[in-house]
A protein has these predicted regions:
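Conserved, function-defining micro-sites of small-solute handling proteins
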Residues: 1-161
Length: 161
């Protein structure tokens, strides 16, 4: 999604950016912190520590509202764009895993997410911990795929062979 969000920002701002492909967020964050990369779209979980250390400046968030972990950072919507998007993390199992096993796994994940210890750690990264049912999570995945497909179509991105 970060590539799609960068392209959406490029279109909204009416600018042209040169994309640089990295093997994951880690190398990109290292390059921006070292001053060899001018701009990136990335997850708060890895950029907040650098923002707090004044090694990078987060100029906007795609979340619907400002987040407690970075109250000084405005949303892109506050800055006049229609860009609102937030990522999610989930626990997945192999296709064909029996439903009772999925339900047991989901129950334990929900308990972990609700724990004070987990919340105290994860909220420092800008993540708002929530849990969902198996079916709710399946709907989130489907909705995300639908939104990404619409963005790809809107931005005129063609499939590479």
């Amino acid at each position: 999604m970060t590539e799609l969000l960068a392209r959406q920002l490029e279109k909204t701002a009416g600018i042209t950016m040169t994309g640089v492909t990295f093997r994951g967020t880690g190398p990109a964050v290292q390059e921006i912190a070292a001053g060899r990369l001018d701009f990136m779209v990335g997850p708060l979980a890895v950029t907040i520590p650098l923002h707090e250390a004044k090694k990078v400046k987060i100029i906007g968030m795609t979340s619907p509202e400002r987040l407690p972990v970075a109250p000084d950072v405005p949303t892109l919507k506050e800055q006049g764009t229609d860009i609102v998007n937030y990522g999610w993390w989930g626990v997945c199992a192999a296709s064909g895993t029996p439903r009772p096993i999925l339900e047991t796994l989901n129950k334990h994940v929900a308990a972990a997410v609700a724990s004070a210890d987990f919340k105290s750690v994860i909220e420092k990264t800008g993540v708002i911990p929530v849990s969902s049912s198996i079916d709710e999570f399946a709907a989130i995945i489907a909705d995300t795929a639908k939104e990404a497909g619409a963005m790809i179509k809107e931005l005129g991105i063609e499939q590479l062979d």
